[in-house]
């Protein structure tokens, strides 16, 4: 015989936020951007529109166009630009609107980012 375990929500000192996934992502991006000026958000319609699912709503207004960048409709270009920014010390966050569009962009990670150190004879380091 066992008593049911107490849920973490049942403890008096625990605060649980009731957020949508989009709102939670927005708050996490905002906190990251406040903590680190090298965090940049980029993607299609992430600026004034706030992203297709409004995940980036208000970020461009608060952090400026130089940190929340609207990009052309070119997922491979978005990720390739992010790779270059990361190598230079920035912390880019890419929004790819739909998972079906990530496959062409994955080449930037597997064929470019993964080989930068060797192609540059060690001058460029991967950002991790």
Task: Locate the predicted segments by residue.
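Thiamine diphosphate
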Residues: 1-128
């Amino acid at each position: 015989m066992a008593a049911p375990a107490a849920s973490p929500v049942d403890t008096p000192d625990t605060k649980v936020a009731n957020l949508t996934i989009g709102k939670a992502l927005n708050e996490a991006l905002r906190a990251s951007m406040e903590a680190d000026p090298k965090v940049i958000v980029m993607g299609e319609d992430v600026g004034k529109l706030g992203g297709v699912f409004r995940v980036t709503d208000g970020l461009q207004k608060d952090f400026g166009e130089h940190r929340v960048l609207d990009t052309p409709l070119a997922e491979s270009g978005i990720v390739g630009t992010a790779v270059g920014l990361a190598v230079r010390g920035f912390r880019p966050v890419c929004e790819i609107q739909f998972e079906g569009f990530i496959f062409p962009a994955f080449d930037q990670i597997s064929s470019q980012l993964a080989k930068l150190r060797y192609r540059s004879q060690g001058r460029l380091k991967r950002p991790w």
